[in-house]
């Protein structure tokens, strides 16, 4: 469904989801931060949720990206609500999550788009948005490695999942990512993303 469209009651679908998610997370303390997550539209009715669980022996660290404001502290200016009597819930997810057993480390990369700070990098060019998004992902991994600047990161990306707002963009985005991330498995899905002006969102897993 169109996550930024407003149903009959007038509120944005994605904001409704954020409001309910905020209420749920407020019932407990999240010592390891919020989950790495992607909230995305679907081409069918209803809601589908999947998640991974790990044992208590696994170290879990929330990851921030200094190019992007943490979504769970977004200002009201970028949250769309048409219910003046209701506090806007922020998107409760971390930019990424590091899971480590002291022998290997896996990074779950949340759904990432062409956002810097909390503002969309607005353009009609899906390739430009794709490359800004990939830069954001690479920078997130670079911060986890303690590096200020990144060399090529493709060898450390295990997989990517790309959500495209417009099905017609699939071929050119695939050609672009084949060049930027050679050898990385990429799945392409047609789905709506969280802001009307954004054309692509990418999530993934990196193995360090």
Where are these regions (language model features)?
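N-terminal presequence-like segments and the immediate start of the first folded domain
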Residues: 1-2, 6-208
């Amino acid at each position: 469904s169109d996550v930024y469209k407003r149903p009959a009651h007038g509120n944005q679908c994605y904001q409704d989801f954020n409001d309910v998610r905020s209420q749920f997370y407020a019932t407990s303390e999240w010592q390891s931060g919020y989950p790495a997550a992607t909230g995305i539209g679907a081409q069918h009715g209803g809601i589908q949720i999947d998640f991974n669980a790990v044992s208590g022996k696994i170290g879990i660290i929330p990851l921030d990206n200094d190019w992007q404001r943490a979504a769970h502290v977004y200002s009201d200016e970028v949250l769309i609500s048409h219910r003046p009597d209701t506090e806007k819930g922020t998107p409760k997810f971390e930019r990424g999550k590091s899971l480590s057993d002291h022998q290997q480390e896996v990074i779950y990369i949340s759904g990432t788009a062409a956002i810097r700070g909390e503002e969309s990098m607005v353009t009609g060019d899906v390739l430009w948005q794709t490359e800004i998004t990939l830069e954001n992902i690479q920078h997130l991994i670079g911060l986890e490695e303690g590096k200020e600047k990144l060399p090529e990161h493709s060898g450390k990306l295990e997989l990517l999942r790309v959500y495209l707002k417009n099905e017609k963009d699939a071929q050119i985005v695939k050609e672009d990512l084949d060049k930027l991330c050679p050898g990385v498995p990429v799945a392409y899905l047609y789905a709506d993303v969280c802001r009307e002006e954004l054309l692509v969102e990418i999530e993934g897993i990196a193995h360090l």
